[in-house]
């Protein structure tokens, strides 16, 4: 046996114990002092480097900071003007629009007051501190919750980020930390912390983090009540440490500090079953409202009426913890969309679906028209699917597939007229065989 077989060696560089000053033993492995020193140098270099190859905020071109697109306090629209803008893009939901318009206007008045106080322009009488009021939107899927929040962000020209509450977990478990919500907002603001701190965050599917029962469980609910607890300080206002690369935080990485005190949080969720909780509190039986022969429209109307009588206690009964409910004082209920509203969504808004497809076909020099009974048939099918306005695009996309596939290669089709029969068949292939030349009356 070689004399070197009895010598211990570094598991990393292979040097023997005689070749180094110190050899540190671990469970089945060894590391020498030279490798330890090399590891320290590598770590020091990485920690000295900036978290990402991004220039300082002052040196980066930023259209918001340039003042070209940044909303000044004097330019903030009044509540009536905000609602008018919302009406251009969102059909119905007038009560929710009013609630949002007033809440957003008051939020930015609060920011203006803070700015005035910092500049020393306020009088002693103006030293009253205005508290933040976050918003909770409750309504069925496809009723316009996310669209309302997105439209608000466009009106006010502030950073806007959307987060999904179902991906969040309590710290220490597999999933996303709640701080990753702030990272999305920071990225939208081009890493401008000051700009991000006056932005809007919409947290969707917030009802999915409700605890499973009202009674405290001995098992840990890491994606339910645990997430609600983690969100408390962020909603109220705190200095949060955000990892610039995302993922989990660890002690050796540099974090960006963001003050959430002035960030407006809008939470949204379907809260399926909340109407039953309210009905139970009111002491009324559903049978008293809905007769066996009533259709889905009657049931939706009753559910919408119950949601308008919602109280914070009902949300606690549903599974939201009292501390969380207390930090979202503004509640707005959205009504289910009926057939009439779905027809309006198809044709009236500035970005209406019919207008979008008309523009797409116009690029191929084809005039697209929908007969009124075809629009009605699309709305009826979307209503049956019970996914609100989201169903409309799927139906129209399926309907227009054949035409949109062939039209770019066809020169003989100059006009397409969509009829109810085509909607029921889910195909417009016959237009390619017999290009439509019907009169255009009753078309959308």
From Swiss-Prot:
CDD domains: RecA-like_ClpX. ATP binds at residues 140-147. It holds the Pfam family ClpB_D2-small. Residues 1-51 form the ClpX-type ZB domain. Keywords: ATP-binding, Chaperone, Metal-binding, Nucleotide-binding, Zinc. The keyword Nucleotide-binding applies. GO terms for biological process: cell division; proteolysis involved in protein catabolic process. Gene3D superfamilies: 1.10.8.60, ClpX chaperone, C4-type zinc finger domain, P-loop containing nucleotide triphosphate hydrolases. One of its GO terms (molecular function) is ATP hydrolysis activity. Zn(2+) binds at residues 10, 13, 32, 35. Residues 50-73 are annotated as: Disordered. InterPro entries: AAA+_ATPase (IPR003593), ATP-dep_Clp_protease_ClpX (IPR050052), ATPase_AAA_core (IPR003959), Clp_ATPase_C (IPR019489), Clp_protease_ATP-bd_su_ClpX (IPR004487), ClpX_bact (IPR046425), P-loop_NTPase (IPR027417), Znf_CppX_C4 (IPR010603). One of its GO terms (cellular component) is HslUV protease complex. Component of the ClpX-ClpP complex. Forms a hexameric ring that, in the presence of ATP, binds to fourteen ClpP subunits assembled into a disk-like structure with a central cavity, resembling the structure of eukaryotic proteasomes. NCBIfam families: clpX, PRK05342.1. Belongs to the ClpX chaperone family. ATP-dependent specificity component of the Clp protease. It directs the protease to specific substrates. Can perform chaperone functions in the absence of ClpP. This is ATP-dependent Clp protease ATP-binding subunit ClpX. It comes from Microcystis aeruginosa (strain NIES-843 / IAM M-2473). The lineage of its organism: Bacteria, Bacillati, Cyanobacteriota, Cyanophyceae, Oscillatoriophycideae. The gene is clpX.
């Amino acid at each position: 046996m070689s004399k070197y077989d009895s010598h211990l060696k570094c598991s990393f560089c292979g040097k023997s114990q005689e070749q180094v000053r110190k050899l540190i033993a671990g469970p089945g492995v060894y590391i020498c002092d030279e490798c330890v020193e090399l590891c320290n140098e590598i770590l020091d270099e990485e920690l000295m480097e900036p978290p990402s190859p991004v220039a300082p905020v002052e040196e980066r071109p930023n259209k918001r900071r340039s003042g070209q697109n940044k909303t000044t306090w004097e330019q903030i629209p009044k509540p009536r003007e905000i609602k008018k803008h919302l009406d251009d893009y969102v059909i119905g939901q007038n009560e929710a629009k009013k609630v949002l318009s007033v809440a957003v206007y008051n939020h930015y008045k609060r920011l203006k007051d803070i700015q005035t106080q910092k500049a020393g322009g306020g009088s002693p009488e103006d030293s009253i501190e205005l508290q933040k009021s976050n918003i909770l939107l409750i309504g069925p899927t496809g009723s316009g919750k996310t669209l309302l929040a997105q439209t608000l962000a466009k009106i006010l020209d502030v950073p806007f980020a959307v987060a999904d509450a179902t991906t969040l977990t309590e710290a220490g478990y597999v999933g996303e930390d709640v701080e990753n919500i702030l990272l999305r907002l920071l990225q939208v603001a081009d890493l401008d912390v000051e700009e991000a701190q006056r932005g809007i965050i919409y947290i969707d599917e917030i009802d999915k983090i409700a605890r499973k029962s009202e009674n405290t469980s001995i098992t840990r609910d890491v994606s339910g009540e645990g997430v609600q607890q983690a969100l408390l300080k962020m909603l109220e206002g705190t200095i949060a440490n955000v990892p610039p690369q995302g993922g989990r935080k660890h002690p050796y990485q540099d974090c960006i500090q963001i003050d959430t005190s002035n960030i407006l949080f809008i939470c949204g969720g379907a809260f399926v079953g909340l109407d039953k909780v309210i009905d139970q509190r009111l002491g009324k039986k559903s049978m008293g409202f809905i007769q066996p022969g009533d259709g889905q429209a009657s049931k939706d109307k009753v559910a919408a009426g119950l949601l308008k009588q919602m109280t914070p206690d009902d949300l606690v009964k549903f599974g939201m913890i009292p501390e969380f409910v207390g930090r979202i004082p503004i509640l707005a209920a959205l009504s289910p969309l009926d057939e009439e509203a779905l027809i309006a969504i198809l044709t009236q808004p500035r970005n209406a679906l019919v207008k979008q497809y008309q523009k797409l076909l116009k690029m191929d020099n084809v005039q697209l028209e929908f007969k009124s009974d075809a629009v009605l048939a699309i709305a009826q099918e979307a209503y049956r699917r019970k996914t609100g306005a989201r169903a409309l695009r799927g139906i129209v996309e399926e309907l227009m597939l054949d035409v949109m596939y062939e039209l770019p290669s066809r020169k003989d089709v100059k006009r397409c007229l969509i009829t109810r029969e085509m909607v029921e068949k889910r195909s417009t292939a016959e237009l390619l065989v017999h290009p439509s030349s019907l009169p255009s009356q009753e078309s959308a």
